[in-house]
């Protein structure tokens, strides 16, 4: 759900949702799915972006396009809601799928644009955020339970103190550098900023349903209020 486009306003909002509003719910969800792990916090990995081979003039142009998605419910639901055809492709097969024309574009973490050489197999990367990347920090539950309450607090608090400077700032700096490099390689007009207002209105019902189905009725409204 956290990767769904326009679920959160930005990375700071997404972190607040995960570490405050839904912290207990996320702990319960992790415990249910991964009984050996304890959820601690999130690190902001930066926004996801859309990449396409052909230029979009608006998000309406996504209708009918085959867009790569990971096996993440929020990403798939968002693409379906705007009329795209999400195609689940593992990350290690993504470059080849784009190269061979299996898909028309992709959604993935923006800061991978240069390191993974996606400029070679797509032309356009849009500056609009298309979901927020959050790296979940977890710990072996046995190791966690062996710590005192004070030690547990120190572990979480230390991570949260270091994350803004040692992790998130680096992702913000990298985004500016990466977009500049993309334009250098693919052309000055290859990182458009689209008007997202219509897409946000289209996406809202799907994102609201997803949030309320997973975390209970009224969750989406609470998220928008913080």
Regions found by a protein language model. Name each.
Residues 1-13, 32-226:
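N-terminal secretory/targeting leader peptides
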Residues 9-31:
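A gly/proline- and charged-residue-enriched helix-loop-helix capping module
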């Amino acid at each position: 759900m956290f990767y769904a486009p326009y679920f959160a306003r930005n990375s700071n909002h997404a972190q607040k949702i995960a570490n405050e509003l839904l912290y207990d719910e996320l702990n319960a969800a992790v415990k249910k799915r991964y009984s050996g792990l304890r959820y601690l916090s999130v690190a902001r990995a930066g926004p996801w972006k859309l990449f396409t081979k052909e230029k979009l003039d608006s998000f309406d142009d996504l209708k009918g396009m085959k867009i790569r998605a990971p096996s993440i419910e929020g990403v798939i639901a968002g693409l379906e809601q705007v009329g795209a055809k999400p195609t689940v492709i593992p990350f290690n097969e993504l470059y080849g799928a784009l190269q061979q024309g299996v898909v028309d574009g992709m959604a993935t973490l923006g800061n991978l644009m240069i390191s993974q050489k996606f400029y070679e197999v797509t032309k356009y990367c849009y500056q609009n955020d298309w979901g927020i990347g959050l790296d979940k920090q977890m710990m072996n539950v046995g190791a966690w339970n062996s710590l005192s309450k004070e030690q547990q607090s120190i572990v979480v608090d230390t991570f949260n103190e270091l994350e803004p400077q040692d992790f998130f700032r680096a992702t913000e700096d990298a985004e500016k550098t990466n977009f500049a490099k993309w334009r250098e390689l693919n052309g000055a007009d290859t990182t458009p900023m689209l008007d997202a207002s219509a897409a946000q209105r289209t996406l809202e019902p799907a994102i609201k349903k997803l949030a309320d189905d997973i975390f209970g009725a009224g969750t989406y409204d609470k998220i928008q209020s913080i």
